[in-house]
């Protein structure tokens, strides 16, 4: 039986994951969060008999239900960054079976860029001072997108700090 990849979230990132998997010839079920049916999703995972993986590309504050369902079915997850919105959600994720944790990951993909890997090899004790600057214009992040109407603008969405956590992750990698 071939693997089925479930992509949950129909924003720009969810659409990109779905398109990338389809271009690789994978079986993809793309589910919009707004029409999400937890019972139907759980049944679909069960039908895959352990041959399913889930890409979670929803707003941060609605992921815990998805993670719980994936854990019940032992389905590995790729969770778009940031991982969670509350400490309770982080604790729940870290509470899932260790084998499933080891087969899942958070989408901090910039840490695998060759420059990041090169810089992270330096001994941070030798740094006198480092300065990080982020030059994003949030109005230009995504096509046909308005920051004021986005999940990142809502307190429940985590705000810009969580949306720009790639940069915080990079700083922590380069200067542990």
Residue ranges and their predicted role:
Residues 92-109, 125-132:
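Rossmann-fold dehydrogenase core element
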Residues 1-39, 45-47:
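N-terminal Rossmann-like dinucleotide-binding module
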Residues 31-38, 62-67, 110-112, 116:
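Recognition helices and adjacent regulatory flanks at domain boundaries
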Residues 17, 37-94:
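Beta-loop-alpha module in the N-terminal Rossmann-like domain of NAD(P)-dependent dehydrogenases
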């Amino acid at each position: 039986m071939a693997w089925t990849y479930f992509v949950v979230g129909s924003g720009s990132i969810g659409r990109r994951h779905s398109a990338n998997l389809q271009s690789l010839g994978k079986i993809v079920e793309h589910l919009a969060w707004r029409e999400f049916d937890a019972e139907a999703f759980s049944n679909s995972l069960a039908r895959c008999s352990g041959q399913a993986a889930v890409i979670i590309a929803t707003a941060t504050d609605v992921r815990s239900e998805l993670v719980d369902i994936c854990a019940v079915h032992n389905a590995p997850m790729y969770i778009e960054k940031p991982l969670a919105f509350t400490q309770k959600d982080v604790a729940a994720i870290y509470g899932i079976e260790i084998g499933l944790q080891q087969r899942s990951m958070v989408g901090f993909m910039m840490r695998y860029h060759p420059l990041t890997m090169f810089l992270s090899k330096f001994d941070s004790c030798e740094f006198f001072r480092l300065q990080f600057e982020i030059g994003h214009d949030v109005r230009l992040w995504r096509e046909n997108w308005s920051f004021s109407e986005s999940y990142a603008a809502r307190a429940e969405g985590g705000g810009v700090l969580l949306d720009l956590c790639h940069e915080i992750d990079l700083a922590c990698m380069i200067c542990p």
